[in-house]
Amino acid sequence: MKGQERMNERFVERMKDPRVTRDAVTLGDFIVIWCDGHHGDRRRGRVLTDGVRLGIYGRREPVLCEECEAHLAYAEKRRAYCPQDPKPFCAYCETHCYRADEREWQRAMMRYSGPRSWRKGHAIDGIKHLLNGRKYRKLAQAKARAAAATTREESR
């Protein structure tokens, strides 16, 4: 595949993982919703990210403006190289893989696209996301309580 020879082998291997692929495709779908809502006046076209070159999107390749394409390319790489396994929600992760500006953009995009995704055919994915979110929130809270208890014990 043209362009694939320049891709990092680790990226290609990680993108073979169905969880990584599913997350990247979901990000692509969400960024399309954001781009449609915020950049409707911009020229958009088929994107050429490494994920597209690998064929992870199938026939549903994202059509985005240049700015959103750059965000998608960055997000694909961050997801592929996530050091956590299983990957927690980024909001509850101790390791921040995203640059601060990119993290803020992703949060805003998710806040906008999440509720709208239900009307775009992602209702089941949304329900799974809510259930997983509750699980990771509880794990993060339990970890914080344990850390606080350890700190209290050490200070005595």
What is each model feature region?
Residues 2-156:
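Cysteine-centered metal-binding/redox modules
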